Amino acid sequence: MQLGEQLLVSSVNLPGAHFYPLESARGGSGGSAGHLPSAAPSPQKLDLDKASKKFSGSLSCEAVSGEPAAASAGAPAAMLSDTDAGDAFASAAAVAKPGPPDGRKGSPCGEEELPSAAAAAAAAAAAAAATARYSMDSLSSERYYLQSPGPQGSELAAPCSLFPYQAAAGAPHGPVYPAPNGARYPYGSMLPPGGFPAAVCPPGRAQFGPGAGAGSGAGGSSGGGGGPGTYQYSQGAPLYGPYPGAAAAGSCGGLGGLGVPGSGFRAHVYLCNRPLWLKFHRHQTEMIITKQGRRMFPFLSFNINGLNPTAHYNVFVEVVLADPNHWRFQGGKWVTCGKADNNMQGNKMYVHPESPNTGSHWMRQEISFGKLKLTNNKGANNNNTQMIVLQSLHKYQPRLHIVEVTEDGVEDLNEPSKTQTFTFSETQFIAVTAYQNTDITQLKIDHNPFAKGFRDNYDSSHQIVPGGRYGVQSFFPEPFVNTLPQARYYNGERTVPQTNGLLSPQQSEEVANPPQRWLVTPVQQPGTNKLDISSYESEYTSSTLLPYGIKSLPLQTSHALGYYPDPTFPAMAGWGGRGSYQRKMAAGLPWTSRTSPTVFSEDQLSKEKVKEEIGSSWIETPPSIKSLDSNDSGVYTSACKRRRLSPSNSSNENSPSIKCEDINAEEYSKDTSKGMGGYYAFYTTP
């Protein structure tokens, strides 16, 4: 009958929940909640209101159709039999507390109370009409929150005692949860996501009882469902999993602040310039090592997440051998040639200069190791912490270490779990003293704006390489005439100084204002013809090269006097005065004029002297000191300017064929003691 099925569902003893006959609660308020004891201890009344609303229809002791009490009282066993209950209650009945002493199953209604509950019958009839049938599948885990009476009422303040449990026989503290095999409802549905920390649980009691095949509660929980008695209380990581093992597995290894602060934090590291590293890695990255130390390119740069913001960490890079082989570049590729030398002594670690620092500091910004230098100097021991000693033709692997330390930077050597190591295979490189693969060299030139130390050597030795990337002229073009297209500038951001004897400068003279480059100014041939190799080699000295640290002056052309035709000189008529010329020459010059005296006197200058000075300066004046709009040498321009400024020769100012020999030596020497002395003092003044 309808009432029997509803009573059957509600009358089964739930795990840890007890029901009492109504005769013990006659003095209560009655109604649908009359089946609960009115004198129960206050800690046990957790969900009484909820229970009265949810079970009011099913806990009624009167039939809906108004059957007599005798008919209902005569068949309590049939309504409460295990056969009618079904297999769905087998697991739940296994953990039920024993029933009353008379051998009957516990029932919320006493047999003698059935005919005398008129008010309960009316409430049951109304509830049965408004509510649907109850099935066990519709009961969620919150139905189990009813407490059982017992001496453990004093432990309700702790979170571990919120749920009913069966104390072990003869033991003051049993496990918090019993361990029946094959329980219908997993305990994970009632636990918070991470369980409870040990600080709030009694130390003598485990959070989980040992099931079949589980040695302990903690072991069963961390087993991950290894046996029928293993409990997966949440979908996350185990609460007290072993930190080293979890670290090896790449998981969190803990639940943040639930354990020891800082011990459960696992860092996540990202290689910032990974696309650039991959470009080099395709061709096998090479890194130059020198005695003085050479910085890496690409350099190591990381982003770090997942650290404890308040903990302190040391961040450093260690460079170790990637394999036990010795390498060499043969046939356009790297091949092994023996075993590596593992006896190389020297510093192998570079500590970031901002170490130690807090986790929030490391996570706030990009961590760059741009100042790390590589050297092959064995004398660079641990005293020089900025250089890492490597051996040429060996493959190395950089590794990033993050070590949790104290505030003063002291590392706890007894806890290796505080060290986290990260390796990126694309950062492997072979240490070399000179680049072997031209692809790597080209990548360095294209991406490294400060790669000047090898650019001139590489360009002079590889400028014959064919291809669209190189705008280099072929051998013996149009027998060394001046009709070739401009080939000084490539498509990329670099300039090849053509300094080979076979490929002496072949530039055309049509480029008026070439753009500036961060390059060494190429030395151009100042001889009388383009095949004069001896004069070219004599002028290729160190004084004509600019230091790498300054920006070079504009690249200009320089030729002997007889090379230019006369119609080219009218372009000089538009020059400004002396002051504007000196401002154009204001760039720092690392040399002094070798042919220009500081002060000229009238008795020191003669016609032969002037001609000799002018003739020699055409050859010895460095070509890179010309201004941006000049087309000839500096001494020639100064002499022509003096003639232009002379009032006696103003009629010849616009002459199309101005020659330096036309200048009157006497007029020239009159002003040199006053004007030219200060003019040439510019070159000799440091």
Swiss-Prot record:
DNA-binding region, residue intervals: 276-456
Compartments, record wording: Nucleus
Induction line: Up-regulated in CD8+ T-cells simultaneously stimulated with TGFB1 and IL4/interleukin-4.
PANTHER family: EOMESODERMIN HOMOLOG, T-BOX PROTEIN-RELATED
GO cellular component terms listed in the entry, alphabetical order: chromatin; nucleoplasm; nucleus
Entry GO MF terms: chromatin DNA binding; DNA binding; DNA-binding transcription factor activity, RNA polymerase II-specific; RNA polymerase II cis-regulatory region sequence-specific DNA binding; RNA polymerase II-specific DNA-binding transcription factor binding; sequence-specific DNA binding; sequence-specific double-stranded DNA binding; transcription corepressor activity
Keywords: Activator, Adaptive immunity, Chromosomal rearrangement, Developmental protein, Differentiation, DNA-binding, Gastrulation, Immunity, Nucleus, Phosphoprotein, Transcription, Transcription regulation
Recorded superkingdom: Eukaryota
Record PTM Phosphoserine, positions in chain: S107
Keyword Membrane: no
PROSITE patterns given in the database record: TBOX_1, TBOX_2, TBOX_3
Organism: Homo sapiens
Residue numbers spanned by region Required for transcription activation: 571-686
Biological role: Functions as a transcriptional activator playing a crucial role during development. Functions in trophoblast differentiation and later in gastrulation, regulating both mesoderm delamination and endoderm specification. Plays a role in brain development being required for the specification and the proliferation of the intermediate progenitor cells and their progeny in the cerebral cortex. Required for differentiation and migration of unipolar dendritic brush cells. Also involved in the differentiation of CD8+ T-cells during immune response regulating the expression of lytic effector genes.
One of the GO biological process terms: cardioblast differentiation
Disease implicated: A translocation t(3;10)(p24;q23) located 215 kb 3' to the EOMES gene but leading to loss of its expression was identified in a large consanguineous family. Homozygous silencing produces microcephaly associated with corpus callosum agenesis, bilateral polymicrogyria, ventricular dilatation and a small cerebellum.
Location, primary (coarse class): nucleus
Tissue: Expressed in CD8+ T-cells.
Protein name per its UniProtKB record: Eomesodermin homolog
Pfam family for this entry, one: T-box_assoc
Stretches the record annotates as Disordered: 27-46, 639-686
Biased composition (Low complexity): 34-43, 646-657
